[in-house]
Amino acid sequence: LRSPLAALKVQTDVAQLSMDDAEGREKALAQLHQGIDRATRLVDQLLTLSRLDSLAQLDDVQPVAIDDLLQSAVMEMYHHAQQSAIELRLHLNASHIVHTGQPLLLSLLVRNLLDNAVRYSPRGSQVDITLNAREFRVRDNGPGISPQALARIGERFYRPPGQDAPGSGLGLSIVRRIASLHGMQVDFANARDGGFEARVYW
């Protein structure tokens, strides 16, 4: 938490020094607002990981329709993707695929994958979400990542070098933990025809 809090302090100082410069003040306040959003997201993710780590098994499980889950997540992410001119394309190659679990946690798993794909995709590209009988995949059209970085994807706080988009390096760790609690496995790879792909299977 030190880094985002230190950045907030710097941004506050800049805003105070820009009291006589309306444009500079507005820019500093906008950066401060973004910094608060990043810090809030980091705290939320840390709390989520802490709660997940304390779970040995899931309570209140129920049958979850994976196709419905993916459709709901795509609709929730639609506006965010549109802001970056990114098209979300859902391919349902199977239907009535049911997995026992906690709907809220499985929804969080899918949202984290979609958020990651949208965040690191170039403007005007596509994100493909594909459901098959025993798996679903989320693939972006970004540049992919190096083999060295790929080996560490999913580690807590790890972010590949050269990432411009803001992030904490916790989203894919949360995905791995939720998947594990549901008897699922997750693979991360560079897609054969370009982009980065997450595969969740059971």
Model regions and ranges:
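Conserved catalytic submotifs in the C-terminal HATPase_c
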Residues: 62-63, 82, 87-97
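Short helix-loop "hinge" at the ATP-lid/N-box region of the Bergerat-fold HATPase_c
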Residues: 117-118
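Short conserved segment of the HATPase_c
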Residues: 145-157
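Short alpha-helical segment of the dimerization/phosphotransfer core of two-component systems
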Residues: 11, 34-42
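Short acidic helix/loop segment immediately C-terminal to the autophosphorylated histidine
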Residues: 16-23
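A conserved beta-strand-to-alpha-helix junction within the catalytic ATP-binding
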Residues: 60-75
